[in-house]
Amino acid sequence: MASGVGAAFEELPHDGTCDECEPDEAPGAEEVCRECGFCYCRRHAEAHRQKFLSHHLAEYVHGSQAWTPPADGEGAGKEEAEVKVEQEREIESEAGEESESEEESESEEESETEEESEDESDEESEEDSEEEMEDEQESEAEEDNQEEGESEAEGETEAESEFDPEIEMEAERVAKRKCPDHGLDLSTYCQEDRQLICVLCPVIGAHQGHQLSTLDEAFEELRSKDSGGLKAAMIELVERLKFKSSDPKVTRDQMKMFIQQEFKKVQKVIADEEQKALHLVDIQEAMATAHVTEILADIQSHMDRLMTQMAQAKEQLDTSNESAEPKAEGDEEGPSGASEEEDT
């Protein structure tokens, strides 16, 4: 195998094997480098070509005169030195990159530990703040409960002093049962106006000369009326719709108009039935009010009689007491006068 450059190639000719492989296992040379003069097998030739891009490799011919590099061997030596320097630089740069990566990883670990410590401190501070907020909320809730208790007590006292809503609603209902013109109970029914009136409305009010009836008579009359008007109107409506729809001469617009007219009639019947039901409710309420009024009037009359009797009894008691006092005085003077006469 050949070794060295320059004059060494003149002394040691090529033996036809690869200079990079082990001597005992070196295969036959296939390429030779024109710059450095070494012979290489196919694998080492590719490696040499990639490592030294400026070198030129040619096919090695066995038995031919060995090719020698230029006499100036300094170029090859310089190139090899430059290659070594480049390799050393690459190694140094790789080592620097590794150290930088280690430093970065260490700094990242330190930052992570700092972040974890900060997170822990933040969590602790959040827990402390949450506990403080819970304590404040509990204290505020206690204060609110106390205030609510006080306000409820005040509200109860105010409610006791004010009217109950149910009482107010009852007062409104009672006011509605009164005549708006005269303020009396609605105890009569006007047949012409179909309205509840008081006893003064047909005398000095707007219902003079109208046909009147009692509440009981009006209630029985309205209740006895046939309530099948709505049912009859619906049956008649269905029959008319069937007849109208079977007529081929009837257009779409005419059918719409017919349906609207028929439903207006049914709506009028429904309104009449509604008015009748409302009249019955009003009459029942007026009858109940009149009945209660009669009962209250009887109670008041009974109370008046009792009060009169109590006043008379008191007057008689006072009179008897006044008549009894002079007799008692005369009895006291009699014995004293007799004793004086005996002394004289």
Curated annotation (Swiss-Prot):
Keyword list, A-Z: Coiled coil, Disease variant, Metal-binding, Phosphoprotein, Zinc, Zinc-finger
Residues recorded as bearing Phosphoserine in the entry: 336, 339
Binding residue positions for Zn(2+): 179, 182, 201, 207
Result of changing residue 64 to Y: Does not affect function in negative regulation of PAX6 expression
Biased composition (Acidic residues): 93-165, 330-344
GO CC field: cytoplasm
Location of region: Disordered: 1-25, 66-165, 309-344
BP GO annotations: innate immune response; negative regulation of protein K48-linked ubiquitination; positive regulation of cytokine-mediated signaling pathway; positive regulation of defense response to virus by host; positive regulation of DNA-templated transcription; positive regulation of non-canonical NF-kappaB signal transduction; protein stabilization; regulation of gene expression
Organ and tissue specificity: Highly expressed in testis.
UniProt feature coiled coil, ranges: 290-325
Short name of any one Pfam family annotated for the protein: zf-B_box
Gene3D superfamilies, per the entry: 4.10.830.40, Classic Zinc Finger
Segments of skewed composition (Basic and acidic residues): 75-92
Keyword hit for Transcription regulation: no
Keyword Phosphoprotein attached: yes
One term of GO molecular function: zinc ion binding
B box-type zinc finger span: 174-215
Role of this protein: May play a role in the process of differentiation and maturation of neuronal cells. May regulate the activity of TRIM17. Is a negative regulator of PAX6 expression.
PANTHER family: E3 UBIQUITIN-PROTEIN LIGASE TRIM
Associated clinical condition: Aniridia 3: A form of aniridia, a congenital, bilateral, panocular disorder characterized by complete absence of the iris or extreme iris hypoplasia. Aniridia is not just an isolated defect in iris development but it is associated with macular and optic nerve hypoplasia, cataract, corneal changes, nystagmus. Visual acuity is generally low but is unrelated to the degree of iris hypoplasia. Glaucoma is a secondary problem causing additional visual loss over time.
Subunit structure: Interacts (via coiled coil) with TRIM17 (via coiled coil).
Protein name, entry field: Tripartite motif-containing protein 44
